[in-house]
Amino acid sequence: MKQAAYGLVLYIFLMLPPVTALAESIMAIHMHMQMPLFVIAGMLMTPFFQKKFPNLFSKWNSNGIPGIILFMIIVLYWMLPRTMDEALTIPAVEIFKFVSLPFLAGVPLRDSWKKLETRVKNIIYISLSAIFGFMAWLYIASPNQLCNNYLIVEQKTLGWGFVFLAACIFIYFIQTLFIDETEYE
């Protein structure tokens, strides 16, 4: 239960107004730090929810596929430039961000990941790498300002962050093909 407490502390910390204002003031930090930290907070709280609602997880997410689909939908939604803008200007959308990333992305991701077959995990790696590559191209190549609240230079910085993430995920996927994980369990 210590892990759930750490997740709750992280969650509350990320919602503090000064922390939120600082994280959302720079586009790359908003997308590549604040949002993943909300997902991590949800992942840390997952064991608490699994103990409190065991039937929900065993019935709803028995093979991990529904949870990983929900995770992917939420992640794709928050990658759209329009949603980042709306999170800064519409309080209801920001509240949705505070709820959806930890509880609709982080919790299902942790619950699903150990249930997924290796083949499905590989599909997720390839999909995320391709999506991040596309988002990198979108943010770097676009001559127009995609987010009204951020400068074009911040948009390009975010795009290069997506290039880095796409490359890292792809390299990790390639190394999983050559390393037998059962040797390290």
Q: At which residue positions do the language-model features occur?
A:
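Alpha-helical membrane segments of multi-pass proteins
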Residues: 1-185
